[in-house]
Amino acid sequence: MKSVFICVICVTLFVTARANTVATADLRDEVNTFLGKELAAHLAAIKSLDPPPDRILGVPTTGEYSWGTFMRSLAAYAETTGNRELAGRDLAKTVGQIGLIESRAGSKAFSQLYAALALRHFGRDLKTNALWQSLSPEEQTAWRSLLNPERFYDPKTNRVIDLAENYLGVASRIASIGYELGISNDRAFLDKLLDRAAVQFTEGNLYADDAPPTGRFDRYSNEYARYIWEAAETVGRKDLLDKIRPSLKAQMRLWWDVVSEDGYGYNWGRSQGVVSYLDTPEIVGFLAAHPEFRPAPLADMAALYYQAWNYLLHDYRADAHLLSIFAFGRGNYAYISRDREWQQTTGFFGKLANSHTSIMNALEKEGITTFPVVPTLPSVARFEFFRKTPERSAGVWVVRQGMLRFALPITTGTKPGMSDYQPSPHGLPGFAAPVEQVYPSLTPFIELADGRTVVATDGADMIEPSANGRTLRARWTRWAVVGLPPGKLQDVGLTSEVVWRIEGGALTREETLSSKQPISIRRWRMAIPSTYSNIDMEMLKRGAVRFKSPKGTLDVTFGADFPVQATVVAAG
């Protein structure tokens, strides 16, 4: 028994003219001026740190990592600009006191990493470090406690406690900075942690599974590899650097093939929205300091950094001194809760300040006084395997062919059927899966007679890309089941074979469902979620749909050898 569904997608974009080049010196001044002005506004709003205010500029400061993020931003600004005072405050003393807030609160993970980075921003010798010297002996003890990664890493089990795998990279950086500064002198503890953190890479993997063994691959693999590299580099672990080098080269090439022209990083996974724009300064900053991993000329990467900065600047509400994180139509994963609005905004300051000097210094050192406003991104059509095994394979199809630009991941999500991890063309202009929703976004959900809903996702049983990268074939005989934990795949008697093709400027998805024995399907459903606000209803009657906006159009034609009913639902 077989059933076939075909979907053809076409994209049209309307392009506007832009300036040609950016002056390096002008951008250096522009960013530093912005940071000084906005950090001063936030700092001036704090009347006392004892007790710390629960709101600043009208938004909560109680979200996870909030104070650690802010102190890192102040410290990075101090090192970037050489300024030791801001808004009438001594920055070293202020950062020192904020660290005590995080220490007393028992804060962990990124709060600890940001504390370690903040301390190092004021110097690598504690005898002359202005922050450290501003602390009393009791306060120094509290800071030492704050910089102990055992708050979330258990050396007995060699695992992080109730956190994703990539947090081993966070623990490694905290421990390496602590060792570098003399906060800790336990080299055996450090090396054991580094060896454990790097194990996926030392075993020969190019990409890290963030929830082993389920096969969850996303932007955290890139961050994880960078963090371990920086930790190993800090304490001279050349053996680990040699093992991680192939991964970083592959991951940076993939990032360059995935990233959007406007500076948006990874289009799939749990880092949607502003987080993916904030990735770009960090990655470009790393590449500015580590030329061996650059996938493109520095001038083009600087242009990408400029695009991300330009987006974030225009997204910033100068009257409120906050990013527009919760504006209408914005989607964020649940970890970016309402009480982290301030934290995400000051995180923007910190990531910008920390990366900006590295990028500007590299440009000036290499004699690049101007660079393009828009990066030259290469055409690409290829499949990158994250994992290739007889049991279950995973990877991503990256396409940048004219107006067809997307990343189609075949990987495991945080839940079966999670929209952001489905094998759909994420980043395709006009198409956008709803963030962190179990929803059939160009990936069908099949409801069986027994009530189970199954989805062809969470890796695949077979992945077969064509040699030219313009066709991708995948097969599922074991299905993800909505409501079960990730990785709990089931053979329900159905086989799905999907073929994606790029032909004549269009993307075609053809799916064949088959079974060896009769199977009752209660419902088959698929949605085409779009960011475009208008729709041509007349076309819908003819088995097609056109989404329209001032940015362009998204045309979708569909058909099947079984009856299909189409409806339109608008959010508002």
Task: List where the protein language model places each region.
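Aromatic-lined, polymer-binding surfaces characteristic
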Residues: 57-284
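Short, low-complexity, charge-dense intrinsically disordered segments
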Residues: 3-10
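Extended polysaccharide-engagement surfaces of secreted carbohydrate-active enzymes
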Residues: 261, 265-268, 275-563
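Extracytoplasmic/secreted proteins, especially bacterial periplasmic and envelope-associated proteins
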Residues: 34, 69, 170, 220, ...
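Boundary at the C-terminal end of the N-terminal hydrophobic targeting segment
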Residues: 17-21, 25
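Non-catalytic all-alpha helical scaffold/repeat segments
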Residues: 24, 28, 32-53, 62, ...
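Hydrophobic h-region of N-terminal signal peptides that target proteins for export
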Residues: 10-18, 59, 71
